[in-house]
C-alpha cells in the first residue's frame, strides 16, 4: 500500500499465478499415460500386457475373461479390428516401457484389474441373450469362403502341371514358377514340396493301408473312421498313436471331405501334443497330417487360431530333417490365407524361415521357406519387420553366391515395395548385384533356360522398383554399367522382362534434369510408359527448360 493509502497493482503477482497454473497443467499432462499403454478393453494402464494372434496388445486378465465368456469385443466399432485370442505372447518390451514411465513420472506401477470388473465391462458390450448375434469362428470362416475359388483354380492347374516335382529331384531354380502376368511376380505353387498326392517312400509312413481304404462308401463311413482315428490318437499306447496318424495321413492326402471332418478341435488338440512327441515316427506323421489338413482353405484359419504356429516354429528350428520339411510346408500353406499373414509374422516365424532358406539341409525345406516368406511379405508389416531383421544383406548374399538365388529374388521383389526395403537394398549394393546376376543369366546353358527366364524377370522387376523414389539409383546403375545389360534384356528377354527393362532405360534417360537437352523438344507421354496395371503410377510433364516432375509411386 502506498503513502496515500491506495493499493498498488503489481503485474508480477499475476504473471506468477499464470505461470504456476501453466506449470500445473503441464505436470498433469505429463502424468497422463500414452494411449498405447492403455488396454483397449479395460481402458487402464496394463500391468501384464500380452500380444494376441491378431497383433493387438491387451491386459492378460482381459484376454482370459474374453476366453471364458467366449466373446470377441469390437474395437472402435470396426468389424475388421476384431481381435483373435487363440494365442498370446507376453509383451515384455511394453511392460518394461510402462514400468519405466511410471518410475519417471513418480506414479505407482499398475496392478492387474479385478476379474469381476473386467467381466462386468465385457458383459455390457455383449448382445442380449435373445438376440442371436455373435461373431464366431465359423462366421469368420464363412465370411472369407467366397474368396476360395481364386486359390483353388490356381491349385488345380498348378498341381496338374507340376505333379512330377513332388516325386522327383529337381534343381532349386526349377521349383520356383512365376506367373506370366504384368503384376508382381506370383508363384503359382500352392502345395508344399513335402506334399505328395500319391503314397510316398518316406520312412515315417508304413504302407500297410491301401490308398482308397477310407471314404469309399458314404458319410456314415467317414464318421466311423473319424472315431477310429480319434480313439487311436487318444490311446496311451505309442503303437496305436502311430497307426492312427498313418490312417489320418492317408485319408487326408487326396480326400477333401476327410480334411474338413478331421480338422476338429478334439483331433487337433491331440495332434498338437503329438507334434512335440519325442518319438520321431509320431512327430513326423503328425506333421504330415497337419500339412494335408492345411491344404483346405477352411482349415487354415482354424489351425492358426488353435496355436499351432509357435509349435511349428520350434520344429523348424530344431526338428529332424523330415520334420523340418513338414513344418516349413505347413507354414507356407497357412500363409496363403490373407488373414493368417500378420499373425504368423507376429508370432515370430520370419527369422526361422529366413534361416531355413539359407541353411536348411533339405531342398524341400528351403523351397517352402522361400515361398512362405514370399507370401508373408505380401503384408506390409511383415515386409518392414523382415527388413529390420537384416534380411536384405542375407538375401543378396544368396543371389551373389547363386545358392537358391531365384527363391531369394522372389522375396527381394516384395521387400522392394517398401521404402525401408529399397533403402536397405541400395545400401547393400543391390544394383550392382542384380546387374551382375543379369549378366550371368545370359551365359546359362539352354537346358537352364526356364530358370534363367524366371531369374531375369525377378532381377529386372527388382531393379524397376529400385529405380523409383531414389535419387541414388541412376548413379549406381551407371557405375554398374546397367544400360548395356538392360538393352540386352530389352532385345532378347521375355515379354515381361522387356517391358520392365524398357521403362528403366527411359527413366534413366529422362528422370534427372541434367540429362535433358537444352532446347527440350516436345514432351513425353509417361502414361504410356508406366505399367498398364497401375502397380507403378507416375506422371511426368517434360517441356522446355522448365521441367515439372511429379511422382506418386506405390511399388510395382
From Swiss-Prot:
In what pathway does it function?
Protein modification; protein ubiquitination
Question: Which parts of this chain are annotated as the region Disordered?
Answer: 1-34
Q: Name one GO biological process term.
A: protein ubiquitination
Please report the stretch or stretches of sequence annotated as the U-box domain: 32-108
Q: Which UniProt keywords apply?
A: Repeat, Transferase, Ubl conjugation pathway
Which residues lie in coiled coils?
Answer: none
Pfam family of the protein (one)? U-box
Q: Which reaction does it catalyse?
A: S-ubiquitinyl-[E2 ubiquitin-conjugating enzyme]-L-cysteine + [acceptor protein]-L-lysine = [E2 ubiquitin-conjugating enzyme]-L-cysteine + N(6)-ubiquitinyl-[acceptor protein]-L-lysine
* Known EC number: 2.3.2.27
InterPro entries in the cross-refs? ARM-like, ARM-type_fold, Armadillo, Ubox_domain, Znf_RING/FYVE/PHD
The superkingdom listed in its UniProt entry is Eukaryota
Could you tell me which PROSITE patterns the record lists for this protein?
U_BOX
- Compositionally biased spans, kind Low complexity: 13-32
Spell out the residue ranges that the record assigns to ARM repeats. 256-295, 297-336, 338-378, 380-417, 418-468
The protein's matches in PANTHER family, at most eight in alphabetical order, are given as: U BOX DOMAIN-CONTAINING, U-BOX DOMAIN-CONTAINING PROTEIN 38
The UniProt function text for this chain reads: Functions as an E3 ubiquitin ligase.
Q: What is this protein called?
A: U-box domain-containing protein 38
> What is the primary gene name for this protein?
PUB38
Amino acid at each position: 500500500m502506498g503513502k496515500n493509502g491506495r493499493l498498488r497493482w503489481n503485474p508480477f503477482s499475476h504473471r506468477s499465478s499464470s505461470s504456476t497454473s501453466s506449470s500445473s497443467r503441464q505436470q498433469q499432462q505429463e502424468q497422463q499415460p500414452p494411449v498405447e499403454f492403455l488396454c483397449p478393453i479395460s481402458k487402464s494402464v496394463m500391468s501384464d500386457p500380452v500380444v494376441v494372434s491378431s497383433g493387438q496388445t491387451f491386459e492378460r486378465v482381459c484376454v482370459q475373461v474374453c476366453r471364458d465368456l467366449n466373446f470377441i469385443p469390437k474395437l472402435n466399432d470396426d468389424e475388421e479390428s476384431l481381435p483373435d485370442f487363440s494365442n498370446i505372447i507376453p509383451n515384455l518390451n511394453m511392460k518394461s516401457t510402462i514400468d519405466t514411465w511410471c518410475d519417471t513420472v513418480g506414479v505407482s506401477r499398475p496392478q492387474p484389474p479385478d476379474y469381476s470388473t473386467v467381466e462386468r465391462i465385457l458383459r455390457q458390450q455383449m448382445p442380449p441373450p435373445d438376440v442371436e448375434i455373435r461373431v464366431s469362428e465359423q462366421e469368420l470362416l464363412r465370411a472369407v469362403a467366397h474368396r476360395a475359388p481364386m486359390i483353388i483354380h490356381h491349385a488345380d492347374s498348378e498341381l496338374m502341371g507340376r505333379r512330377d516335382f513332388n516325386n522327383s529331384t529337381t534343381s532349386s531354380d526349377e521349383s520356383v514358377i512365376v506367373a506370366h502376368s504384368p503384376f508382381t511376380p506370383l508363384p503359382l505353387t500352392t502345395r508344399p514340396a513335402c506334399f505328395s498326392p500319391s503314397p510316398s517312400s518316406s520312412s515315417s509312413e508304413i504302407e500297410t493301408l491301401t490308398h482308397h481304404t477310407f471314404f469309399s462308401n458314404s458319410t456314415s463311413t467317414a464318421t466311423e473312421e473319424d472315431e477310429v482315428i480319434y480313439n487311436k490318437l487318444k490311446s496311451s499306447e505309442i503303437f496305436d498313436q502311430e497307426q492312427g496318424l498313418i490312417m489320418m495321413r492317408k485319408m487326408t492326402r487326396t480326400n477333401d471331405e476327410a480334411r474338413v471332418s478331421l480338422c476338429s478341435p478334439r483331433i487337433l488338440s491331440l495332434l498338437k501334443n503329438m507334434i512335440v512327441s519325442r518319438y520321431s515316427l509320431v512327430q513326423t506323421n503328425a506333421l504330415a497330417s497337419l500339412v494335408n489338413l492345411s491344404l483346405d482353405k477352411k482349415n487354415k484359419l482354424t489351425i492358426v487360431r488353435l496355436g499351432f504356429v509357435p509349435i511349428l516354429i520350434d520344429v523348424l528350428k530344431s526338428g529332424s530333417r523330415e520334420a523340418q520339411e513338414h513344418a516349413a510346408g505347413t507354414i507356407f500353406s497357412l500363409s496363403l490365407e490373407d488373414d493368417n499373414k500378420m499373425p504368423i509374422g507376429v508370432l515370430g516365424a520370419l527369422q526361422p524361415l529366413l534361416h531355413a532358406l539359407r541353411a536348411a539341409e533339405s531342398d524341400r525345406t528351403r523351397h517352402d521357406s522361400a515361398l512362405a516368406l514370399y507370401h508373408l511379405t505380401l503384408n506390409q508389416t511383415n515386409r518392414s519387420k523382415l527388413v529390420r531383421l537384416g534380411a536384405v544383406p542375407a538375401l543378396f548374399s544368396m543371389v551373389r553366391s547363386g545358392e537358391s538365388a531365384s527363391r531369394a529374388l522372389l522375396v527381394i521383389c516384395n521387400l522392394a515395395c517398401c521404402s525401408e526395403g529399397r533403402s536397405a537394398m541400395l545400401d547393400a549394393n543391390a544394383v550392382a548385384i542384380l546387374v551382375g546376376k543379369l549378366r550371368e543369366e545370359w551365359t546359362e546353358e539352354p537346358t537352364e533356360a526356364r530358370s534363367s527366364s524366371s531369374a531375369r524377370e525377378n532381377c529386372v522387376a527388382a531393379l524397376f522398383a529400385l529405380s523409383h523414389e531414389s535419387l541414388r539409383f541412376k548413379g549406381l546403375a551407371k557405375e554398374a554399367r546397367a544400360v548395356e545389360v538392360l538393352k540386352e534384356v530389352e532385345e532378347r528377354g521375355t515379354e515381361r522382362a522387356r517391358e520392365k527393362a524398357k521403362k528403366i532405360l527411359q527413366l534413366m534417360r529422362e528422370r534427372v534434369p541434367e540429362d535433358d537437352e537444352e532446347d527440350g523438344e516436345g514432351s513425353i507421354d509417361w502414361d504410356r510408359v508406366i505399367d498398364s496395371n497401375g502397380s507403378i503410377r507416375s506422371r511426368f510433364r517434360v517441356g522446355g527448360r522448365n521441367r515439372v516432375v511429379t511422382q506418386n509411386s506405390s511399388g510395382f
